[in-house]
Amino acid sequence: MENDAARDRELGMQRRITRRDFLDGVALAVGGAILSAGAPWLSATQAGHEVSAPEKSSNYYPPALLGMRGNHPGSFEVAHRLRDGTFWETAGKPEDTGEKYDLVVVGGGISGLAAAYFYRQAAGSKARILILENHDDFGGHAKRNEFRVGKRLLLSNGGTQSIDNPSEYSKVAKGLLTELGIQLHEFYRDYDSKLYDHLQTACFFDRETFGTDRLVVGMNALPWKEFLAQAPLPEMAKRDIERVYTEKADYLAGMSPAQKRTELAKISYAEFLSKYCKVSAQALPFFQKFPHDLFAVGIEAVSALSCFENPDDYESFKYAGFDGLGLGEPHDQDPYIFHFPDGNASIARLLVRSLIPGSIPGHTMDDIVTARANYSRLDQAGAPVRLRLNSTVVRARHKGTPDQAQEVEVDYVRGGKLLTVRAGRCILACYNMMIPYLCPELPEKQKAALHYDVKEPFIYTHVALRNWKPFAKLGTQQIVAPGGYHSLSKLDFPVSMGKYEFPHQPEEPMVLFMLRCPCKPGLPRKAQYRAGRWELMATPFATFERNIRD
């Protein structure tokens, strides 16, 4: 314990990090949500007071919150009770708000916002639409992070990063981007693809996995023999890694291209390396976490074909062993540059700006970046479209038999009160695995299908740095850590748009992105995801902070 305490002091764990989670009016927003979560089943009559509207506070601004975001406390407790079958035991009767809409959309992420957008196109501008969202902010996976370092505003994505391969989008999806004012060709101007040209990828070998702590710069840039000479790896592992990257042998000789693809689809990448490439077990830890950034599991749980067909978007590593197979290059992909400074949060914000005039100022894809959303305008009485945050839907059902009903009733919890609204239609654009619990009329077969998937547990951490001089001095822009708590740490995407200027000089503040996937190697893939999600839910913020500082 003394050693742990000394290490914490060395890491600065006792030094205060400013967290705006509980300040001024924001305390009402976040703290109130947490407090009400303890008794989310209280009916309006039992609660005996009006539902609070923390969003009306001038200080309510979720993008500026720090600490644990994503599925933050207050966003999931009601849903967990619904899942566990305990919610309705004490829920009582919902209070009818008296509201009636043409459409209620469950979920305020990009899919829910887009559903409202398309419905309004079809039904007309006078259509009355209510969007219910359980989180304290809209966007779903497309959230926005804001940091202030002195007077400098830094932006980063709070989830989904980029418009990935837009050339493959459907006509409808491409049309939506165009209608929102997103001009894809502008990203070639805004994304500074040369800023990091002089900075290389580094690999951090940790003592727990490799026997000593060592950072080696030049991964993928130096000749492999020169790079590996500095690595704390057994000589056999070094020889195997160098060989599999450089000899370009056909490890599946005798098979046709179709047979090779079939075989690669049947085996994991770990099996491909060990069985066909004859890579020793000592070398496998170097490759173990390569698939984390896309698949959230290691090389033992991802097919070799998936690795071949999905090269790393960050160009932090390259999968070895495929160059000599004669399968050509993976299908052409668009460059990974279609990135707003706040990631795809700008798409969600453009949708909200279109749906709710006055909520976010401006008119273009450039001015959306620095525009401040007015959360008090999202749920205005009398507005055609209303977006209601901090509202967890617990039931959606027809009023009457499904084949004859003219209305849908949607029950939700907000501020500790159970409420209901009515609508002519309802779209469930929420977390798919919750739909069987909140829509009892679904056929059992469809419920089973919705239960099948398991979400990948990604932990995206964004850290505001006072400057990035240490990275410039080391000559690196990203660090791969095969055995580390975070498998990747990299400087943010270099995008300047409108009035937002990316920090180009090492003396300027910078956002550092860190990736962790809490998977459990050895278990089946879905079991790893479930175990990882449990770990994530049980991990205190101090653990993340300690490993960020380490």
Locate each region found by the language model.
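Active-site/ligand-binding neighborhood in enzyme catalytic cores
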Residues: 246-391, 402-405
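N-terminal export signals
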Residues: 15, 21-43
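Glycine-rich active-site loop/strand segments that organize a redox cofactor
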Residues: 57, 61-64, 139-171, 309-330
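Glycine-rich FAD pyrophosphate-binding loop
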Residues: 120-146
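N-terminal Rossmann-like FAD-binding beta1-loop-alpha1 element of flavoenzymes
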Residues: 102-130
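Dinucleotide-binding Rossmann-like beta1-alpha1 core, especially the glycine-rich loop
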Residues: 150-240
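N-terminal secretory signal peptides
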Residues: 1-17, 21, 45
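C-terminal segments that line or cap access tunnels to active or ligand-binding sites in enzymes
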Residues: 328, 332-339, 397, 401, ...
